[in-house]
């Protein structure tokens, strides 16, 4: 029996990244559906703070694909890239007359799925 490697995929997940999900979305929209060889170059020249954790996660997903499935990095494509909102860190900032204003610090969960490029 032959194993069909065309539909196999692997993923990498980063949770509780201390950056807003909307700021990460503008970065991951640029690499969705791209070849793995193109995606790190795109992230390198974008000037956003969210590029660093996304590029780390992308290299981790490629390492998972090469180790677990034996995929070549040249044959890999980012099939699914998504970001979800994580838990909100809630803090209070001291204000005048003994009051405190709530401060919400957002987190996000980033998922990158890599599969073999369809020929």
From Swiss-Prot:
The keyword Plastid applies. The keyword Coiled coil does not apply. It holds the Pfam family Ribosomal_L22. Keywords: Chloroplast, Plastid, Ribonucleoprotein, Ribosomal protein, RNA-binding, rRNA-binding. InterPro entries: Ribosomal_uL22 (IPR001063), Ribosomal_uL22_bac/chlpt-type (IPR005727), Ribosomal_uL22_bac/org-type (IPR047867), Ribosomal_uL22_CS (IPR018260), Ribosomal_uL22_sf (IPR036394). It comes from the Eukaryota. GO terms for molecular function: rRNA binding; structural constituent of ribosome. GO terms for biological process: translation. One of its GO terms (cellular component) is chloroplast. It is found in: Plastid, Chloroplast. Its main location: plastid. Part of the 50S ribosomal subunit. NCBIfam families: rplV_bact. HAMAP family: Ribosomal_uL22_B. This protein binds specifically to 23S rRNA. Belongs to the universal ribosomal protein uL22 family. This is Large ribosomal subunit protein uL22c.
């Amino acid at each position: 029996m032959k194993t069909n490697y065309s539909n196999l995929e692997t993923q990498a997940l980063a949770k509780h990244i201390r950056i807003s999900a909307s700021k990460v979305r503008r970065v991951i929209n640029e690499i969705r559906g791209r070849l793995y060889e193109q995606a790190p170059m795109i992230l390198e020249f974008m000037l956003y703070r969210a590029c660093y954790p996304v590029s780390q996660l992308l290299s981790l997903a490629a390492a998972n694909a090469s180790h677990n499935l034996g995929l070549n990095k040249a044959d890999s494509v980012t099939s699914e890239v998504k970001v979800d909102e994580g838990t909100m860190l809630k803090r209070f900032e001291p204000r005048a007359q003994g009051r405190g204003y709530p401060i919400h610090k957002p987190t996000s969960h980033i998922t990158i799925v890599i599969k073999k490029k369809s020929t």
